[in-house]
Amino acid sequence: MNRILAPADATRRRWLQAAAAGLVLPPWAAAAQAKPAHELPLPTVGNALPLAPAPLLGGGRFDPAQAEGRVLVLYWWASWCPFCAEQSPEMQKLWDAQRGRGLQMLALSIDKTPEPAVAYLRKKNYSFPAAWLGPELQRSYPKPEGLPVTVVRGKDGRVAQAEKGQLFPEDVAQLARWL
């Protein structure tokens, strides 16, 4: 049975279709755009993890020679990431407690520009070594999928642990077991 829609019914139907599309499309579109094509799976435990020099946001430079024969924690984060905001204070505690025992750390900000990362580090009084993962550094330290990402490079230069997502405080503290 064909029914001719009155103008009010047609307008209402278009409005409902637009509203339904608005509810479904933005999350899908945001999810499709949020995942950069250059993200990789986590490094495999046991594989060699080569390092490259990196300019630090607070000045100075990360030199891979600093990490030879030592444990290095690589930490991919962003100033806008709520999970990173929960984990970063724990990373600072780990840095404060273990750097005297030889722990090395390199936090890699994936912010679009270095300015938000610098402002965030200053605001939170974080002192762990941090670099901005710009296009050049991205080639040496490609960001694994997910955020935050924590990778431990053992004294032998191989991946000892690789974690995607927020770590609980006790999990961050346990990273010291690799020392």
Identify the meaning behind each predicted range:
Residues 1-14, 18-27:
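N-terminal secretory signal peptides
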Residues 28-51, 119:
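N-proximal helix/coil linker or "cap" segments that precede and/or mark the start of modular domains
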Residues 52-71:
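A short beta-strand-turn-helix
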Residues 71-72, 148:
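Alpha/beta-hydrolase fold active-site loops
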Residues 76-90:
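Conserved redox-active cysteine motifs that mediate thiol-disulfide chemistry
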Residues 88-107:
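Conserved helix-turn-beta segment immediately C-terminal to the redox Cys motif
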Residues 103-114, 128-134:
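Thiol-based oxidoreductase modules, predominantly thioredoxin-like and allied folds used
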Residues 124-126, 134-175:
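Thiol/disulfide oxidoreductase modules built on the thioredoxin-like
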